[in-house]
Curated annotation (Swiss-Prot):
Mg(2+) binds at D205, E231, E257. It comes from Enterobacter sp. (strain 638). SUPFAM superfamilies: Enolase C-terminal domain-like, Enolase N-terminal domain-like. The keyword Magnesium applies. This is D-galactonate dehydratase family member Ent638_0932. GO terms for biological process: amino acid catabolic process. SMART domains: MR_MLE (SM00922). Belongs to the mandelate racemase/muconate lactonizing enzyme family. GalD subfamily. Homotetramer.
Amino acid sequence: MTPVIIKNIECFITRPDRHNLVTVRVTTEQGITGHGCATFQQRPLAVKTLVDEYLQPLMIGRDANNIEDLWQMMNVNAYWRNGPLMNNAISGVDMALWDIKGQLAGMPLYQLFGGKSRDAIPAYSHASGETLEALFASVDALIAQGYRHIRCQLGFYGGTPSALHAPDNPTPGAWFDQQEYMSNTVEMFHALREKYGWKLHILHDVHERLFPQQAVQLAKQLEPFQPYFIEDILPPQQSAWLEQVRQQSCVPLALGELFNNPAEWHDLIVNRRIDFIRCHVSQIGGITPALKLAHLCQAFGVRLAWHGPGDMTPIGVAVNTHLNIHLHNAAIQEFIPRSATTNDVFPGAPEVKEGFVYPPVQPGIGVGFNEALALAHPVLYRPHEWTQSRLPDGTIHTP
């Protein structure tokens, strides 16, 4: 097979809307270019440094055909591995290599992987409101667009803002009352079922804001409302408690958007403590490890619901879609609407039609990258306040 030699690797950060999006471009000596998503919204400049200063000199002159070998080399080259910075940098290169391979084969990625398992993947999007009435309006708008799977949040992300029993001169942050949140969430599910019945598939994100005993309690309280799944009911470092949740509730559990290391998901999958894996593909190192994770999940009956937030490039969205179209155990795709400017920077990205996402059909990933327009929207970084979640006494908590 003719070698496809890597000539250059570049990293771009663009902010066409409210998120800093990180894109990696790999160029071969034959002039073929591939693009990948390396977005780490909270640390974009660090990812760019890793790509520019470390991965670029490591990869130039190597054969782009050998994706598995190149991924393994990038993974161990720094000796220390499996962190969010390095994984995202590796992901950008890895996705770009798959993009190149698809172009060389003349196939969209899902065909390169082995073809379709389904015609389209069901999508879900986010509904929220400060009041139940506002939440209903948000749900109604999504139903009108064809969605039948909707993530519902009442008030502040995961719950409502709390001014209860706050200390004098409280530390700045996103204050959060766990007991208030739990009560409001049960009320929300009851109201949603009363209004929409059982045809609407309701998802909810706890966003790891509970203590383990509270997670058990909430899972039991939500069981009568039959949620499609409850996401991140506990943080990764408390995942051993999922056995207790499992023993006391049959609510489907989804976990994984914060995972970086295979050791974080292996036991949960093998012991069947989760129903859905929610890993962020770039956060675990790209397409190459995502395929392996998906096959592990299939062997143990765990379904795929890749993390798909607004702070990922449309290239990453398309990768999720290609994986979902191919992989038999894919369940659903998270989908966040994009601005017109973002679509101009990344032309050809997937869209939702009547509640389903369809993959690009062009060879490779199938999403373009307008460099000139991307550079017209440069990076703008500021500290993220929403991650400074605090309990009513001012204690910092997992966001």
